[in-house]
Amino acid sequence: MRRYEPIERSAAAIAVAVAAVALVAAVAVTVRGHDKVWAHAATTTSGDPQRGQAMFIQYGCGSCHHLTYVRKATGEVGPPLDGIAVRAVIAGKLSNTPDNLQRWIRDPQGVTPGTGMPDLQVGERDARDISAFLYTRSG
């Protein structure tokens, strides 16, 4: 069995420490980036993205729409919602603005009569929060 010299053990310990620091830094940057995205979505929509995620689930949006990393969002009837925050158009014809997204969520039949998206009687606050959550989904 090979015996390691103290200098080799020290070098290995330093390498492990550097790798650990790099990992912590990467996680911190990711968390900070996540927080910025969520804060921007909240500011843009005047909604609460965290509550919006709960409302997305409560209204059963995932039964029709797929959204990665959201439990019960495995639907295939409606369009997938990953990347909705960076789409130019929503509902097939509306500019992707917070007001338009909230209008679409609240009254899809009023926007496009006969659309497959049902009117779920989503209130103003819930629509604002759901739109805030969806605007966290840039890809």
Label each residue range with its predicted role:
Residues 55-58, 119-121:
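Flexible gly/pro/ser-rich segments immediately N-terminal to CXXCH heme-c attachment motifs
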Residues 61-64:
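Short cysteine clusters
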Residues 32-57:
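Electrostatic cytochrome c docking/interface patches
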Residues 67-70:
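Cys/His-rich metal-chelating microdomains
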Residues 1-9:
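Short, Lys/Arg-rich N-terminal segment immediately upstream of the first membrane anchor
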